[in-house]
Amino acid sequence: MYNLRNRSFLNLLDFTSKDIRYLLDLSIDLKKSKYAGIEVQKLKGKNMAIIFEKDSTRTRCAFEIAAYDQGANITYLGSRGNQIGVKESMMDTARVLGRMYDAIGFRGFSQQTVECLANYSNVPVYNGLTDTAHPTQILADLMPIEEHKGSLKGVKIVFCGDGRGNVANSLLKGCAIMGLDFRIFAPKELFPDSNLTLKAKSLALDSGGKITITDSKEEAVKCADVVYTDVWVSMGENNWEDRINLLRFYQVNKEIMDMAKDSAIFMHCLPAFHDLNTVVGKDIFDKYGINGIEVTEEIFESKNSVVFDIAENRVHTIKAIVVATLG
């Protein structure tokens, strides 16, 4: 049996294509079992803490439902109501929680923080998001690509927008490892780190994949199987004017989707600013006249959109990670 027991899930570069393939297959099996009502609980008696410096809907719910479905107990530690970083360092917190819990999930700012948790807790630690990486999201992205396209190898996927964000960075790694034809369509100012790009291209040579970083719409989008985008301003940032000026021509709209294949699917990790039904969306419209920021309402609500498949798959993929490393 494939063994990932006691491994932390911090960075996709820590894992091989076989590791990721195993986790995807387990995710699919767990999803089928849940729908069939025959899921076997493998985490009875286990206790997990999740530390969230950044608020979340999908990530928190996915961790909690994954734990409940598998019979584990879970404790949520938010940005308020604890002493982490105020009266107690993360190093000391890690050593305390490691004595109490069997695993720890983290969603926050610094990659160094989640690595500190893993180094000092001596239990598996799962990265639910940092400023530079979002590895659990990428498993949830790869799963619907395979569900809708039949396989991963050679699938052409283009990411439109901020090429240096945590989702773009992690997609770059995951697609390179798993052999996809991955393109980033972004302004040169927001190209990913050159060292990361070189690493991804090296991995793609081994996997049969391909990496393209470009500000050419035609080069990036033509004949794409998957079109992906993310918000233009990350949590904790507030530079909307600069981003809109830089990225307004990288919005996913009908023109972009018409350049992709007719069968292309649209993906977004959520939350998405696609209408005027949020405070941010309305504020941006009032200031800049943009209805829909990184994606238009037309594309978000189209038959090609699989955004809610991705959201659901967060449960199954996080569950697979926890079961594989703790069960």
Swiss-Prot record:
The record's Gene3D superfamilies line, in alphabetical order, gives: Aspartate/ornithine carbamoyltransferase (3.40.50.1370)
Q: What is a biological process (GO) this protein takes part in?
A: arginine catabolic process to ornithine
SUPFAM superfamilies in the record: Aspartate/ornithine carbamoyltransferase
Q: Name one GO molecular function term.
A: amino acid binding
Keywords tagged on the record: Arginine metabolism, Cytoplasm, Transferase
Keyword Cytoplasm appears in the UniProt entry: yes
Enzyme Commission numbers on file: 2.1.3.3
**PROSITE patterns, alphabetically?**
CARBAMOYLTRANSFERASE
Keyword Cytoplasm applies: yes
Q: Which residues bind carbamoyl phosphate?
A: 56-59, 83, 107, 134-137, 269-270, 314
Judging by the UniProt lineage, the source's domain of life is Bacteria
Where does it primarily localize?
A: cytoplasm
GO CC: one term? cytoplasm
Q: In which pathway does it act?
A: Amino-acid degradation; L-arginine degradation via ADI pathway; carbamoyl phosphate from L-arginine: step 2/2
What's the catalysed reaction?
carbamoyl phosphate + L-ornithine = L-citrulline + phosphate + H(+)
Q: Which NCBIfam families match?
A: orni_carb_tr (TIGR00658), PRK00779.1 (NF001986), PRK04284.1 (NF003286)
Which family would the database say this protein is a member of?
Answer: Belongs to the aspartate/ornithine carbamoyltransferase superfamily. OTCase family.
Annotated protein name in UniProt = Ornithine carbamoyltransferase, catabolic
What is the organism of origin for this protein? Borrelia garinii subsp. bavariensis (strain ATCC BAA-2496 / DSM 23469 / PBi)
Q: Which gene encodes it?
A: arcB
